[in-house]
Amino acid sequence: NINNINNISLDDFIYLGVIYSNNYKFTYASQRVAPGRGLNIPGRHVKNGFVVDKDDYIVLGAHPDLRYKIYDTPFGKQGKVYDAGPINKNHLNVYIE
């Protein structure tokens, strides 16, 4: 894993599997494998391999209490929680194509 980096590529993220940045654990899931009902998002599309919303936020899964919260990510843009995901509030799941 990698600690506290910014602008990591999607390919590197997939290779590593887990990234720790800004006191958060980032993992990923494919929208094809985990198409939760939380992914019913207006304007959802894929950009550079990441699932994003109409405002270009990377779509995240996290503890249900964090829904719609915005986070800095190590991918050069912010993410927004839409889907229920990990129970630990410091764990954010990034949706990819």
PLM regions and their residue ranges:
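Solvent-exposed, well-ordered loop and adjacent helix/strand elements within mature globular domains
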Residues: N1-E97
